[in-house]
UniProtKB/Swiss-Prot annotation:
Name of this protein: Enolase
Active-site residues from the entry: 205 (proton donor), 344 (proton acceptor)
Binding site for Mg(2+): 243, 292, 319
Keywords on record: Cytoplasm, Glycolysis, Lyase, Magnesium, Metal-binding, Secreted
Function: Catalyzes the reversible conversion of 2-phosphoglycerate (2-PG) into phosphoenolpyruvate (PEP). It is essential for the degradation of carbohydrates via glycolysis.
SMART domains associated with the record: Enolase_C, Enolase_N
Length: 435
């Protein structure tokens, strides 16, 4: 009765109005699962391939009909007849069917849509929540949210090189309270921006994109918003994080970090050593607990030097650096580069490989941060993954836009369902830092 009888994909739109895939999986029993696939703006060069049509006459070349056809005509034929509960076998079958190291034949977007839909159909068949199906009886940790309240870089038109300025309510007692703290700071920030005559339009991930005078102006304004909302900045309250997305402004030919790409003529040009010095300066000055992609994705020497300098004090997250890939993560662990991995399901393409990356990170003492993409949908699977794996941290945007709020609302439901079992670890989620 749990045998897959039908698999169907269609083209839908993501939060940026670009095409993406939605996949449905059906079983003999009538159990059903649906998965929707996100898409990134700043992407690592080593990510699994997101298959696009390239037909400029349709969606500017971003159509996904090829990936849809691959699901309906190739993948469906291969997995119909499988037991929907056999996630690993199905994921491995799709990987083998593709046959390329980066899922470039069928498309990681095609494969991921099926992988998510299969898991949801299995949970539906067993009549259990998705997080419980994926994580088992030990599922209990609600993630500390990284809330991206200011967007820069490739996520907005704001003249700031760093892509995200985030707040983390590490001192909150529960996830529900953490969400409230974040929302109140977000609204306080909006008021401050209006008073300064700055724009309050939001970027791709729901954060504001004002024309600040620079990075420090952005941080100082966030600190004022934290205070205005009635909270304190620091380990007992709310801490700050960056996604530098350094690969977006790294000049490989000159081997420099060229901030002028986003900040104009006044933007600094820094060597790797100067980039590390600058990040350390910010950490010394402000209550910063996490920095994502502080160095270029191919600057391994820079990453090792940054980790040696700041790795005991700050969570150093590899996103473009690791691309949710166990091969790159294994090298990072061996070379002591970074101390955390960002987990994006569409960077690798299956739930099986996603869970393997999280497990490898934890075994090495690295933290794992489950993350959305800038092009999202109403699919809230990453919320369930964060809880199922007890990852301890989630990054899913600001406190606006339904595509972001859908994940937060799902986490509220899960916290309610878990009841007294639920744990919110806050500052303890950063378990590999020296306090």
């Amino acid at each position: 009765m749990s045998i897959i009888t039908d698999v169907y994909a269609r083209e839908v739109l993501d939060s940026r109005g670009n095409p993406t895939l939605e996949v449905e999986v059906y079983t003999e029993s009538g159990a059903f699962g649906r998965g929707m696939v996100p898409s990134g703006a700043s992407t690592g060069e080593h990510e699994a391939v997101e298959l696009r049509d390239g037909d400029k006459s349709r969606y500017g070349g971003l159509g996904t009909q090829k990936a849809v056809d691959n699901v309906n005509n190739v993948i469906a034929e291969a997995i119909i007849g499988y037991d929907v509960r056999d996630q690993q076998a199905i994921d491995r079958a799709m990987i083998a069917l593709d046959g390329t190291p980066n899922k470039g034949k069928l498309g990681a977007n095609a494969i991921l849509g099926v992988s998510i839909a299969v898991a949801r159909a299995a949970a539906d068949y067993l009549e259990v929540p998705l997080y419980s199906y994926l994580g088992g009886f030990n599922t209990k940790v609600l993630p500390t949210p990284m809330m991206n309240i200011i967007n820069g870089g490739s996520h907005s038109d704001a003249p700031i090189a760093f892509q995200e300025f985030m707040i983390m309510p590490v001192g909150a007692p529960t996830f529900k309270e953490a969400l409230r703290w974040g929302a109140e700071v977000f609204h306080a920030l909006k008021k401050i921006l209006k008073e300064r005559g700055l724009e309050t339009a939001v970027g791709d991930e729901g954060g504001f994109a004002p024309k600040f005078e620079g990075t420090e102006d952005g941080v100082e304004t966030i600190l004022k918003a934290i205070e205005a909302a009635g909270y304190e900045a620091g380990e007992n309250g709310i801490m700050i994080g960056f996604d530098c997305a350094s690969s977006e402004f790294y000049d490989a030919e000159r081997k420099v970090y060229d901030y002028s790409k986003f900040e104009g003529e006044g933007g600094a040009v820094r060597t790797a050593a100067e980039q590390i010095d600058y990040l350390e300066e910010l950490v010394n000055k402000y209550p910063i607990i996490t920095i994502e992609d502080g160095m270029d994705e191919n600057d391994w020497d820079g990453w090792k030097a940054l980790t040696e300098r700041l790795g005991g004090r700050v969570q150093l997250v590899g996103d473009d650096f690791f691309v949710t890939n166990t091969d790159y993560l294994a090298r990072g662990i061996k070379e002591e580069a970074a101390n955390s991995i960002l987990i994006k399901v569409n960077q690798i393409g299956t739930l099986t490989e996603t869970f393997e990356a999280i497990e490898m990170a934890k075994e090495a003492g690295y933290t794992a941060v489950v993350s959305h993409r800038s092009g999202e949908t109403e699919d809230s699977t990453i919320a369930d993954i964060a809880v199922a794996t007890n990852a301890g941290q989630i990054k899913t945007g600001s406190l606006s836009r339904t595509d972001r709020i859908a994940k937060y609302n799902q986490l509220l439901r899960i916290e309610d369902q878990l009841g007294e079992v639920a744990q919110y670890k806050g500052i303890k989620s950063f378990y590999n830092l020296k306090k």
